[in-house]
């Protein structure tokens, strides 16, 4: 009986460990992270709005969100600096007016998002590398989309809720 009890206990422990490993693996695999470095040969990303599509394009030093009819857009532009060789990243609204300065980078933008494949909630952010002016250390800067609305959509400024999908990368 003692051997049977030990064997049963070992079997139950093995099943429990296997179950924990499966749950952990599934939790990790639920998220898909995709990176794009914008260097002039970037993918076009279609943003699916409940009513219409927004388009994200990257050409040269510009990263642009735009409505297909051109009635509204938002642009991030990298300006080369003659002082230190870095690019200054500035944000413009659809009227072409600068809204804010968001950082600087030695190379390009990187687009990163994580998608929950079971109930696709999408976290979207811009990432770029820079150098801390005080310590001289390399740092990573992140510009995040403002808010999560529910399990399906993210809110982009005042534009409503969107879903982001890779199209041609």
Show which residues each predicted segment covers.
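Sec/Tat signal peptide C-region and signal peptidase I cleavage site
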Residues: 22-28
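Bacterial N-terminal signal peptides
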Residues: 11-20
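Lectin-like carbohydrate-binding module/patch detector with strong preference for beta-trefoil
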Residues: 28-169
